[in-house]
């Protein structure tokens, strides 16, 4: 095996290992979602609880997805899965997400009028939805800080730069 190929494999293995770990915050979100939607507190979640928990974590799950998860992980045929199984499924799904695609989805949540830009109005709506009581002056300052082309709005390229720390 050539030295170049060997070092490429080492780099690839390192990248893969790095990518295969959740942050502590992500781990806590998974635990919180399970506990929140385990409505009967029996330490297992059924079809409906699983579907809602997955959606709360940002997954657009279809009925077939939820049924497959239950089929694959419900070893005792109870119609439920445990936290350990839920954690395994959700961890895999989170690690398979494309970060760039997730950033574009987030941009679309702000850009509800499909203008291709985040305006003061868009930012005000999101702040209000998140329970943030911010003045227009504060919101304008946020836009100005990241508005590299000076048009008074945040375009997709500027948003990606914000989210990836390239600003």
From Swiss-Prot:
Its main location: cytoplasm. Keywords: Calcium, Cell cycle, Cell division, Cytoplasm, Cytoskeleton, Metal-binding, Mitosis, mRNA transport, Nuclear pore complex, Nucleus, Phosphoprotein, Protein transport, Repeat, Translocation, Transport. InterPro entries: CALM/Myosin/TropC-like (IPR050230), EF-hand-dom_pair (IPR011992), EF_Hand_1_Ca_BS (IPR018247), EF_hand_dom (IPR002048). Ca(2+) binds at residues 147, 149, 151, 153, 158. Residues 25-60, 61-96, 98-133, 134-167 form the EF-hand domain. Monomer. Component of the nuclear pore complex (NPC)-associated TREX-2 complex (transcription and export complex 2), composed of at least GANP, 2 copies of ENY2, PCID2, SEM1/DSS1, and either centrin CETN2 or centrin CETN3. The TREX-2 complex also associates with ALYREF/ALY and with the nucleoporin NUP153. Interacts with USP49. Belongs to the centrin family. This is Centrin-3. The gene is CETN3.
């Amino acid at each position: 095996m050539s030295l170049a190929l060997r070092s490429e494999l080492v780099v690839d293995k390192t990248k893969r290992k790095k990518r295969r770990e959740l942050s502590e915050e992500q781990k806590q979100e998974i635990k919180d979602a399970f506990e929140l939607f385990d409505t009967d507190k029996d330490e297992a979640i059924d079809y409906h609880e699983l579907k809602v928990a997955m959606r709360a974590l940002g997954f657009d799950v279809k009925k077939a997805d939820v049924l497959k998860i239950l089929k694959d992980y419900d070893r005792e045929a109870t119609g439920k899965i445990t936290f350990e199984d839920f954690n395994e499924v959700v961890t895999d799904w989170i690690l398979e997400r494309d970060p760039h695609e997730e950033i574009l989805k987030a941009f679309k949540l702000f850009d509800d009028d499909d203008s291709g830009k985040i305006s003061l109005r868009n930012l005000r709506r999101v702040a209000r939805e998140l329970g943030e009581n911010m003045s227009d002056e504060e919101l304008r300052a946020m836009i100005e800080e990241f508005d590299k082309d000076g048009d008074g709005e945040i375009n997709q390229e500027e948003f990606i730069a914000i989210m990836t720390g390239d600003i």
